[in-house]
UniProtKB/Swiss-Prot annotation:
The gene is prmA. GO terms for cellular component: cytoplasm. This is Ribosomal protein L11 methyltransferase. The keyword Ligase does not apply. It comes from Symbiobacterium thermophilum (strain DSM 24528 / JCM 14929 / IAM 14863 / T). S-adenosyl-L-methionine binds at residues 156, 177, 199, 240. Pfam families: PrmA.
Amino acid sequence: MRYLEIRIRCQRAAADAVGNLLLTLTGAGYAVDDPLIVEQNRSRWDMTDLPPGDPEWVTVSGWLPEAGDVEQQRLRLETGLDEIRSLGLGAVDPARFRWVEEEDWAHAWKAYFRPTRVGDRLVVVPAWEEYAPQEGELPIRIDPGMAFGTGTHATTALCMRWLEELVTPGSRVIDVGTGSGILAVAAKHLGAAEVVAIDVDPVAVDAARENAGRNGVEIDVRLATLDQVAEGEADLIVANIIASVIVDILPDVASRLKPGGRFLASGIIAARKEAVTEAMTDAWLLPVGAREQDGWVAILAMKP
């Protein structure tokens, strides 16, 4: 089915009235693109590709199904917009229209997820695809669902390539912010004796457990934060999250690593590299290396 997308740019004071008009016409709600929300939160995000916008203006959108009387609804829309303009709430631009196709968003992304070699041995494989590993390959079968990435993003790839060098047989690994569990599965495939995977999101915990089962590995997946994991036991802690959270957990990282243990931190934009490195030093962790890909950085530190 096709839908007629309606986009109306208006001043903030008129947004509620425009939204209510679209709600009445479509019966299915509306969306508001608000640059003020972006600006208020920009400092909290490591990155955003949204350009600054005029905070006095927003864009309100709604969608009409092709099956309805679209032309009649367009006439009702124009009449309604004229009425809103007459109220003097704020300027309302003419509506813009375009046809959009309905897609099965829950499955369309799968067409772009293919087996991908990430390191020398690790290969990320969609759970629904047949794959015959070549000699020496370690396939990781992942179904990320709609909530997690496919494991091929630069932040994850940096971690996986480094894990191939860092994980030793018999080691204990903690994966902080495990998400789909891909790094935990990788560590287990590479020979770790024990892997603890933690996340604060119940959806992530369920996904990680399912992906561990798909790969036939035993992983201790917990709904927990790092301070709830026993101290002084880990040979390696890996965290592919964001810079601000990495900095926040550094004291807990230091107390949970064995002497000589390593901390692998990823999910850091290049602009935050120096700040994270300095924070590691302040937490008595010695930065020993950094690698960059596509503007993202992974930093390796050691507990003396």
